[in-house]
């Protein structure tokens, strides 16, 4: 719903240098697929309840018109599979990855089921929107794409590579206080 958030900081530093060469980013505004003049993309939950739900017809149309067959689709949701280092590494091998940034109470479940969408969570907490979660996922994945990091060994020597946390880090000067 807010494509203007992207690429954000991903357009800076090493990620920014690699953007357009080693990785690409496209955004879709689902409001462009709304059927009314006000571009409404949400409605109240069927059966009642608090909050709003992203409408099935709008989301499905945006997916159908923008995603090719067999491309992986992930809906960023607090109830999904927990995102971790191992999964980031696995996703870095995908030719294309489509992230749905949720808002409100979520998206109509019928779209998730009918489009073979995987739900992924970055943790047990609630964010105001899925864009922050998308940045977490993208940042983690981009590190594994060969050539993105300045040093090829950096991604292989990460603290999680051996299942352990990294040792304390120091730099110069040796005595600072």
PLM segments and residue spans:
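N-terminal nucleotide/polyanion-binding subdomain common to many enzyme families
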Residues: 1-66
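A short acidic, often aromatic-flanked loop/helix-cap motif at beta-alpha or helix-coil junctions
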Residues: 31-36, 81, 126-129
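Short, well-ordered secondary-structure micro-motifs
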Residues: 38, 85-87, 110-112
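S-adenosyl-L-methionine/SAH cofactor-binding core of RNA-modifying enzymes
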Residues: 53-103
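Structured adenosyl-cofactor binding patch, chiefly the S-adenosyl-L-methionine
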Residues: 111-153
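Internal, active-site/partner-interface "lid" segment
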Residues: 132, 144-177
């Amino acid at each position: 719903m807010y494509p203007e958030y992207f690429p954000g900081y991903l357009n800076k530093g090493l990620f920014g240098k690699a953007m357009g060469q080693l990785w690409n980013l496209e955004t879709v505004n689902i409001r462009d697929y709304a059927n009314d003049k006000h571009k409404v993309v949400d409605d109240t939950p069927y059966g009642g309840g608090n909050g709003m739900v992203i409408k099935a017809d709008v989301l499905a149309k945006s997916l159908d018109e923008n995603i090719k067959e067999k491309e992986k689709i992930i809906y960023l949701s607090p109830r999904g599979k927990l995102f971790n280092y191992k999964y980031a590494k696995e996703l870095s091998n995908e030719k294309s990855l489509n992230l749905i940034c949720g808002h409100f109470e979520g998206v109509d479940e019928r779209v998730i089921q009918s489009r073979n969408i995987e739900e992924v969570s970055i943790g047990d907490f609630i964010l105001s929107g899925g864009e922050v979660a998308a940045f977490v996922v993208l940042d983690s994945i981009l590190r594994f794409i060969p050539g993105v990091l300045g040093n090829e060994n950096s991604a292989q020597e990460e603290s999680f590579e051996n299942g352990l946390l990294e040792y304390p880090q120091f730099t110069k000067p040796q005595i600072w206080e």
